[in-house]
């Protein structure tokens, strides 16, 4: 099947909602970083906040490339901000996990390994383009020309329908796209590695912060990482297997969920930490 044509306003609204979610999440994470009352550590929230802002900037570039310039490239300048977003998120989640001095049981290690293997398999399969058998057209049946048969007539050339020319992208954008295209395979593999690390770190985060008063905010962060993984895997699958795919499909809503869940987690952490500090003062 081919990509479904979506109205321009729909794609703009989708990008707008993603940007609002990640921008709000970034500001709330930075508020936690600036606050001395945060229990889980300020550096943790600095890293996650940098990840949110990196995604915000990368998505801004990608939206301008796709909607503003009408280019659907394999690599865009936004990719050079999406990749640091993985690094910052992984760094922040790792610091949060290490602060718990995690001691997993054999069953928990088994769950972690199983999810890692499944995450690798899903990410690799989603990125690999499918090769359907029906792509090859069957050979045309021809009849031999006999002496009694009329001579084969040359094909009649029909004048092609005049189509509206697509909007021409600026020369600098086309030149930049041509320079970045050779890096497409490398960046695709970086996304696979980033997605796998993200889902493993999210699982570890759930195991580390399953109970306790301050665990709720980190469960939201873990679910945010899972949402990011789902949206990213879908996008890799769609761009590799759906011809003329346009962004804005329903699974991409998980990117919006991801930003919203980080914002909720950061707000909960701030609320619980400031209440804890106020309670100590009254005590």
Q: What function would you assign to each model-found segment?
A:
Residues 1-283:
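Polytopic alpha-helical membrane-helix bundles and their juxtamembrane interface segments
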């Amino acid at each position: 099947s081919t990509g479904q044509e979506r109205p321009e306003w729909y794609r703009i609204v989708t990008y707008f909602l993603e940007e609002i979610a990640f921008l709000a999440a970034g500001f709330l994470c930075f508020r936690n970083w600036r606050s001395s009352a945060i229990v889980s550590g300020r550096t943790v929230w600095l890293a996650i906040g940098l990840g949110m802002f990196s995604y915000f900037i990368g998505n801004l570039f990608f939206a301008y490339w796709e909607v503003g310039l009408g280019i659907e490239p394999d690599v865009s300048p936004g990719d050079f901000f999406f990749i640091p977003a993985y690094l910052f998120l992984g760094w922040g989640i790792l610091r949060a996990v290490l602060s718990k001095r995690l001691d997993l049981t054999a069953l928990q290690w088994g769950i972690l390994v199983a999810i890692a293997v499944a995450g690798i398999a899903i990410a690799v399969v989603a990125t690999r383009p499918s090769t359907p058998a029906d792509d090859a057209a069957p050979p045309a049946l021809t009849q031999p020309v006999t002496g009694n048969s009329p001579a084969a007539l040359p094909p009649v050339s029909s004048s092609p329908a005049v189509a509206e020319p697509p909007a021409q992208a600026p020369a600098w954008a086309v030149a930049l796209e041509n320079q970045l295209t050779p890096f497409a395979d490398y960046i695709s593999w970086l996304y696979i590695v980033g997605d796998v690390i993200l889902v493993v770190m999210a699982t570890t985060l759930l195991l580390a912060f399953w109970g306790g008063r301050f665990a709720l905010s980190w469960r939201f962060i873990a679910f945010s990482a899972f949402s990011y993984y789902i949206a990213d895997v879908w996008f890799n699958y769609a761009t590799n297997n759906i011809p003329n795919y346009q962004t804005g499909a329903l699974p991409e809503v998980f990117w919006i969920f991801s930003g919203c869940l980080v914002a909720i987690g950061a707000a909960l952490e701030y609320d619980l930490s400031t209440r804890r500090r106020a309670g100590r003062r009254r005590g």
